[in-house]
Amino acid sequence: MDITPDSIIYWQWQWINLNATIVFSWLVMLILVLGSWLITRNLSIEPPLSRWQVALEIIVEQIRQQIRDASQQKADQFLPFIGTLFLFITMANLLTIFPVYQSPAGSLSTTAALALCVFVAVPIYGIKNVGITNYLRHYIQPTPVMLPFNLISEISRTVSLAIRLFGNIMSTSLLVAILISIVPLFFPAVMTLFGLLVGVIQAYVFTILAMVYIASGMNLQQRKTGNHHA
């Protein structure tokens, strides 16, 4: 039983290896790119709309609404980044319905990379919205003594974001595999559905936390400057 897709090696040459994490990450990206191209190539504003376009509009509007609820900010500027995170993690977890597939989210390297993207996005959005001086100033609030603690807080929440997603996906996959091996005649369908549900929930939790982290740096300064957006 493989706990993480990192341990499944398909090809190796010296220190370079091609493992399941890399293969299935590219598979998920390929599916998302092709799916996006197929759905958006014939978009229309006149009815009747295709079922795929209706489904896409529902998904985009739901993501936009969740961004507004979580951040109390206008959603459009965050939609490409937050939407991509959600769709990638969700698709990566939903494909576990296929027996040979291993979710890349079950690898700590994948979740660390996703958390690192959030870590970089936080100052980018913060500086873009409140300016570099106002953004950097929040690291010394309420006093300059808090600078190291605020920096540690930034790093620790990024680490927790990566470990939370990795731990939940890995533990769920392990639990499903154990139960299926114990009672293979009764639990496979139920446990597979349970794994899919947990995967979608974890994608939702990860993206909402990412949005909250991004909004937090902006809100701190907007409250000070009186430019808070409703």
Curated annotation (Swiss-Prot):
Subcellular location(s) per record: Cellular thylakoid membrane
Domain of life: Bacteria
Signal peptide start-end: none
Key word Membrane present: yes
Pfam families: ATP-synt_A
Keyword Lipid metabolism: no
InterPro entries listed in its UniProt record: Alt_ATP_synth_F0_Asu, ATP_syn_F0_a_bact/chloroplast, ATP_synth_F0_asu, ATP_synth_F0_asu_AS, F0_ATP_A_sf
UniProt GO cellular component terms: plasma membrane-derived thylakoid membrane; proton-transporting ATP synthase complex
Its membrane topology: Multi-pass membrane protein
Record-annotated membrane-spanning stretches: 20-40, 78-98, 112-132, 174-194, 195-215
Major subcellular location class: membrane
GO biological process: proton motive force-driven plasma membrane ATP synthesis
Keywords per UniProt: ATP synthesis, CF(0), Hydrogen ion transport, Ion transport, Membrane, Thylakoid, Transmembrane, Transmembrane helix, Transport
One GO MF term: proton-transporting ATP synthase activity, rotational mechanism
Subunit structure: F-type ATPases have 2 components, CF(1) - the catalytic core - and CF(0) - the membrane proton channel. CF(1) has five subunits: alpha(3), beta(3), gamma(1), delta(1), epsilon(1). CF(0) has four main subunits: a, b, b' and c.
PANTHER family in UniProt: ATP SYNTHASE SUBUNIT A, CHLOROPLASTIC
Primary role: Key component of the proton channel; it plays a direct role in the translocation of protons across the membrane.
Family assignment from sequence similarity: Belongs to the ATPase A chain family.
Name the UniProt record assigns to this protein: ATP synthase subunit a 1
Organism annotation: Crocosphaera subtropica (strain ATCC 51142 / BH68) (Cyanothece sp. (strain ATCC 51142))
